[in-house]
Amino acid sequence: MKPWAAFHLIFLVASSVEGDVSNYGTGGTQDTEPTCCTEHQCISDKIILQGQPGIPGIPGVPGINGSEGLKGDPGPQGLPGETGFDGIPGVAGPKGDKGDQGDKGDKGDKGDKGDACILDDCPPTDVEVRNCQDLLEHGEILNGWYTIYPTKENPMVVFCDMETDGGGWLVFQRRQDGSVDFYLDWESYKKGFGKQESEFWLGNDKIHLLTSSGTQQLRIDLEDFEGSRTFAKYSSFSIGDENEKYRLIVGSYLDGSMNDSFRIHNGHSFSTKDRDNDTNKGNCAMMYKGAWWYFHCHHANLNGLYYKGKHANYADGINWRSGKGYYYSYKYADMKIRPQQSETTVS
């Protein structure tokens, strides 16, 4: 039943009872005290009826948040967590300062004896090897490039001829195929140039050093394009330093299979196309396309142009006046020195 219907029924009952009570009071046969039901409370002449609870109302609007309370005291420290994974390595720091030198270590055991060294990578040895003759006396018998020590401070790589005329010759000039340009300047002849496997000029500074202590014999070998070989040998050979313009000092002609064409250059300075030290009004090096101890100008021109035998130009090839003359250029030429010996073998 709806609440309002129940209330209406109670109201009608109440009205009916009120009518009955009124009748008892005015003209009824019995005048008695009014009686109320257990649910009713009688106050004076009114009856107050108690109805059932109504439906709950809609919730009100939430109130405003209160102000923030004070910060509480720190709680007790928790247990340590598990170890995390290793991180990525950081960037390397700057290089530190160089540390102090360590103490000298103990001396090691003596090593095994090495193989014989004959090439240009040989280290210094206790054996005094000043020239190719010293190498020959210490058992080196093969032609090739060796390291010698004219002085302890000046090791030098040189080509040694260990076969010709008893061996022990140090070659400072070689021509054989025209693969190297010999028409070069003063600085090139000073320092040296060329290829070990073919043609080269050792260098005037080195030639001066090699000939400045002890008497050196000189041998010149030539070969023409017909295969004929000739040579000339001189008792001594040396050149001055650069301040002396590499002045030539050559001794007497000893022997050979070709006549002398070199001693006439004795006492003359070295000339190149850019350094004219000859006695000619012109520049002999430029005229005859070489570099040499020219006077006015030459009887030998072993640093001239490389022609294959006969040539039309006058005296600008590898010429030897007393040999094939000024219009023939030799196929092969070399100049070499060796310490003077008491006895000489000719070949």
Curated annotation (Swiss-Prot):
It comes from the Eukaryota. Belongs to the ficolin lectin family. Veficolin subfamily. This is Ryncolin-3. One of its GO terms (cellular component) is extracellular space. It holds the Pfam family Fibrinogen_C. PANTHER family: FIBRINOGEN/TENASCIN/ANGIOPOEITIN (PTHR19143), FICOLIN-3 (PTHR19143:SF415). GO terms for molecular function: antigen binding; carbohydrate derivative binding; signaling receptor binding; toxin activity. Residues 62-115 are annotated as: Disordered. It is found in: Secreted. Residues 121-341 form the Fibrinogen C-terminal domain. Residues 57-114 form the Collagen-like domain. Hydroxylated. Residues 95-115 have a biased composition (Basic and acidic residues). One of its GO terms (biological process) is complement activation, lectin pathway. Initiates complement activation and/or interferes in platelet aggregation and/or blood coagulation. InterPro entries: Collagen, Fibrinogen-like_C, Fibrinogen_a/b/g_C_1, Fibrinogen_a/b/g_C_dom, Fibrinogen_C-term_domain, Fibrinogen_CS. The lineage of its organism: Eukaryota, Metazoa, Chordata, Craniata, Vertebrata. Residues 1-19 form the signal peptide. Disulfide bonds join C132-C160, C284-C297.
